[in-house]
């Protein structure tokens, strides 16, 4: 089975973000994994709050994924800060950066 990682925010209403990505993966018979960049309070009327994941916790999520079930593909959505973008680059750049992850 193919695997995919979504890096994005979590939408409590299920219409966007991690939740929507995982539904899409499942519909295409892809094993989905997620690394959450932020929790959002939102619905179809709008976003009322955002709580960003700490860079340390975000890195812990990516470490857990990339040391076990390495994804065949990565989909990136909402990334809430420059620090989280820089962490994403350590795991998703075309050049190997394993030594920089520590």
Regions found by a protein language model. Give the residues of each.
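Short amphipathic alpha-helices and their capping/turn segments at secondary-structure boundaries
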Residues: 22-23, 85-90
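N-terminal glycine-rich "phosphate-gripper" loop used for MgATP/nucleotide binding
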Residues: 72-85
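Small-residue (G/A/S/T)-rich helix-start motifs and N-terminal tracts that mark the onset
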Residues: 1-73
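Conserved small/polar residues in nucleotide/adenosyl-binding loops
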Residues: 91-98
